[in-house]
Amino acid sequence: MFQALSDGFKNALNKIRFQDDEKALDRALDELKKTLLKNDVHHKVARELLKKVESQTKLNGIGKQQFLDALEKSLLEILSAKGSSGFTFAQTPPTVVLMAGLQGSGKTTTTAKLAHYLKTKNKKVLLCACDLQRLAAVEQLKVLGEQVGVEVFYEENKSVKEIASNALKRAKEAQFDVLLVDSAGRLAIDKELMQELKEVKEILNPHEVLYVADALSGQDGVKSANTFNEEIGVSGVVLSKFDSDSKGGIALGITYQLGLPLRFIGSGEKIPDLDVFVPERIVGRLMGAGDIVSLAEKTASVLNPNEAKDLSKKLKKGQFTFNDFLNQIEKVKKLGSMSSLISMIPGLGNMASALKDTDLESSLEVKKIKAMVNSMTKKEQENPEILNGSRRKRIALGSGLEVSEINRIIKRFDQASKMAKRLTNKKGISDLMNLMSQAKNQTPPKMR
């Protein structure tokens, strides 16, 4: 995410080499302008950002650090709007949220992603299928609800208003914390759609109306969001499909253009790939500093503290087993796409695009490891050191792999186990900190 913009900002920075060089500042601003417009930032937003950066840089004296500080401060101002980040809960549950958007915007999938996000916060969520315009919408929400592990409310041969009313009643009676209503979409905005949304909104009296905007729609998405806001009132925007070769400009400008807070960003195809939009954190990514806080939050949502402690003890003693290995793979899968996770780590933003299609679920290597482990006895799974030649031949036969592949996987597992053991001791932690420090020092000031 934001890699093209981040690279463009670095190019602009490199135009400034000496202090108090106004011509260099002009070149940097020109490069910044090209980057913004090339990445689909609205011309009014680009003009305002350039104005802020120029004014702030000149105020503090022209130089690389001053330009960076001005850019960081100006980006934060452009990205900030009145309203909350992430999800806001009502004082008295259930919190009712009406999800709105055009057909094909990813509204239904985003609704399920939001349900997953809330479930990681230990909230009881009810999904309501009110999109009766698209034939597969109800079925899609049912399937997604099952994947997430939340209840989906739907009714046949009922009007949208009846379904919404009954869903609200169900949410209150069963003491759900949150009710997410997937409303109808259209290929284009029309009076019929808006009238239906107004009627549903009147019945639900929702605490939030979140508009799902397709990141690939560019400025058309901003215009559509503005129309929805004028017609039914929108409290926040969720940007979907942001990983799909999006230029990133819509995220940079939609808050400033509409005056509405951007609440979440869909950062991948997987259900967990939904990131809270916190302006300070996004500026960090834009400046090449990653987003360690969001990464820590995602990790904490799937890791049990007691399990982590037990695993740490095993690693220190060199007792990491194949079962532990598979368990950790399952944990990582729950965090979302690899590219989304990598983009949060300082200095590794460039790797995110290379890992865009990396999927642990469909990875051939992971499938081979699973096949190998499933062909082992319980004793072998817990004691890798007993895997002699005859055992490896039997495992190869049972898993459909070559003995050479079994040997290779076991060797890599052994290397990983030794490395993990090394990193759990004091010297290993020191080495890791030094490595992170080196990576940090390879980038320009503040472009961490």
From Swiss-Prot:
Top-tier EC class: hydrolase
Family: Belongs to the GTP-binding SRP family. SRP54 subfamily.
Function noted in UniProt: Involved in targeting and insertion of nascent membrane proteins into the cytoplasmic membrane. Binds to the hydrophobic signal sequence of the ribosome-nascent chain (RNC) as it emerges from the ribosomes. The SRP-RNC complex is then targeted to the cytoplasmic membrane where it interacts with the SRP receptor FtsY. Interaction with FtsY leads to the transfer of the RNC complex to the Sec translocase for insertion into the membrane, the hydrolysis of GTP by both Ffh and FtsY, and the dissociation of the SRP-FtsY complex into the individual components.
A biological process from GO: SRP-dependent cotranslational protein targeting to membrane
Domain of life: Bacteria
Keyword Ribonucleoprotein: yes
Residues annotated for GTP binding in this entry: 101-108, 182-186, 240-243
Gene behind this protein: ffh
Keywords: Cytoplasm, GTP-binding, Hydrolase, Nucleotide-binding, Ribonucleoprotein, RNA-binding, Signal recognition particle
GO cellular component, one term: signal recognition particle
Main localization, broad class: cytoplasm
Name of this chain's protein: Signal recognition particle protein
GO molecular function: 7S RNA binding; ATP hydrolysis activity; GTP binding; GTPase activity
